[in-house]
Amino acid sequence: MAGFPGKEAGPPGGWRKCQEDESPENERHENFYAEIDDFAPSVLTPTGSDSGAGEEDDDGLYQVPTHWPPLMAPTGLSGERVPCRTQAAVTSNTGNSPGSRHTSCPFTLPRGAQPPAPAHQKPTAPTPKPRSRECGPSKTPDPFSWFRKTSCTEGGADSTSRSFMYQKGFEEGLAGLGLDDKSDCESEDESNFRRPSSHSALKQKNGGKGKPSGLFEHLAAHGREFSKLSKHAAQLKRLSGSVMNVLNLDDAQDTRQAKAQRKESTRVPIVIHLTNHVPVIKPACSLFLEGAPGVGKTTMLNHLKAVFGDLTIVVPEPMRYWTHVYENAIKAMHKNVTRARHGREDTSAEVLACQMKFTTPFRVLASRKRSLLVTESGARSVAPLDCWILHDRHLLSASVVFPLMLLRSQLLSYSDFIQVLATFTADPGDTIVWMKLNVEENMRRLKKRGRKHESGLDAGYLKSVNDAYHAVYCAWLLTQYFAPEDIVKVCAGLTTITTVCHQSHTPIIRSGVAEKLYKNSIYSVLKEVIQPYRADAVLLEVCLAFTRTLAYLQFVLVDLSEFQDDLPGCWTEIYMQALKNPAIRSQFFDWAGLSKVISDFERGNRD
């Protein structure tokens, strides 16, 4: 279109352009342009018939736009910011001089490009300043320093009119995050980030209602937040859940904590992926130490582990699972026992929940141990060189002994007692070592141990626990002489234990002894429990399964009163009974796999 300013000069009626180019072709014409410029007017004017001379500029074709949006300058090859077109360059093209609007380019320049230089002036590239002068050698480089030194931050109506709506939306976003220009993240040593002085002038110009100084000022404020938060990443805690979480703020201490937390969370126990290992088959005898609290089970296990070393696998009591996983079941149980709220349904429900939690680790570990048993090798009698698998308690205590004690104390209802009893399982080869101790000595050891949750236990509690063990032991003796079906018939009231003795073709035990065992056993309690519903098949099946499972066990009795502080002598007694009893047998296990599994259970118990 003819007459458009900034267009190349054509024939003698077009525009004449006096801009020097740095290309090699125009270098030889340098003197020629200088001679012509000596005779040319200071202001370029259009010539010829297409000049439009004498016409009024009503349509605004020659008016330079005044609301150019500021452009972000690209990054140069050296990594420094190339200054962009500033507001000063824009306002210089909008002066009152009629020729000034023709000396610069009215169209939008590409990013990083410079407006045409006036005559007699060779355009020069901007000299970038080193960052060390702006932010100091020990401070974090400021990404907005290149912009603060331009005239765009000087304010003015033209510099804020187009970007005001963007800036207002940005203000609302910062307000939603609890951030503003006077954020608490700003410190005294950041005095170079103050608001430009033109803001007060603009506020006075608008009658006290000053507009914000533009979008880039708020970006600079955002840079202050970024700089401060990068030094104090702990303040991100109050910004949790907001868009500020996308910032990648590095802090040495937080990084170490994150790595430690990630390492802890990704550590998977070997029991989950025990697949690629070389099995080592060894014969081992499984012993389960049982007894009242404080008799010395843990002390004995620690002694045997130190003596036998790799020939022994010690399975500790799962105390951490009982006390630190979800609720503290030990504390809740002792609280119900000491309060003695007998015969209440809510108490029975709480006790049932605790007992079910006590049974979980034993059932899980028994299942895992069963998977590592080499059944093809069978079982054999205990030999002197066999290994030992020593457990701190058996599932028998959690599902039979202590529930029986709680049932007799009226802390557990009949229905809840049946629920716990149904969880009892045992494997052939499990040997129970019942460590008995008189109540006085047991109470002394319990107080010496000094556990807080055991402070409310008294001698009556220990006596009731010993009675429960005795009842289970008497029931086990009955399973060694009578068939499980006959014992269940006695519990259902279909016959008596004396009749069963007389009907036996080869009586092994006298009827008087059998009657005494029955009265002291758990079966006398079971008869009372199932009597109202003795025709129910489920109750009878629970009793039958319990009797059959109980017959799998073997018992070793040790009176600790005879071995006062004599751990080697106590172990000798246990060892000799295991060798003499042909029913106590060793089984073949994958010793390497079992060691890894138990080590993970033991590690979890220590954490």
Swiss-Prot record:
Please tell me whether the keyword Isomerase is annotated for this protein: no
**In what ranges is there compositional bias, type Polar residues?**
88-106, 148-160, 194-203
Q: What's the Enzyme Commission number for this chain?
A: 2.7.1.21
Subcellular location(s): the record lists: Virion tegument; Host nucleus
Q: Name one GO cellular component term.
A: host cell nucleus
User: Which InterPro entries does the protein's record reference?
Assistant: Deoxyribonucleoside_kinase, Herpes_TK, Herpes_TK_C, P-loop_NTPase
Give start-end positions of Basic and acidic residues composition bias.
17-32
| Enzyme type, top EC level | transferase
Q: Keyword annotations for this protein?
A: ATP-binding, DNA synthesis, Early protein, Host nucleus, Kinase, Nucleotide-binding, Transferase, Virion, Virion tegument
| Gene3D superfamilies reported for this sequence | P-loop containing nucleotide triphosphate hydrolases (3.40.50.300)
Q: Where is the active site?
A: 317 (proton acceptor)
Note, other: Phosphorylates and thereby activates certain drugs like acyclovir (ACV), valacyclovir, and famciclovir to a toxic form, that leads to successful suppression of the infection, while the uninfected cell does not have this ability because it lacks TK.
| Entry similarity comment | Belongs to the herpesviridae thymidine kinase family.
* Record PANTHER family: DEOXYADENOSINE KINASE (PTHR10513:SF35), DEOXYNUCLEOSIDE KINASE (PTHR10513)
Quote the function comment for this protein.
Catalyzes the transfer of the gamma-phospho group of ATP to thymidine to generate dTMP in the salvage pathway of pyrimidine synthesis. The dTMP serves as a substrate for DNA polymerase during viral DNA replication. Allows the virus to be reactivated and to grow in non-proliferative cells lacking a high concentration of phosphorylated nucleic acid precursors.
Q: What is this protein called?
A: Thymidine kinase
Q: Which organism is it from?
A: Epstein-Barr virus (strain GD1) (HHV-4)
Originating gene: TK
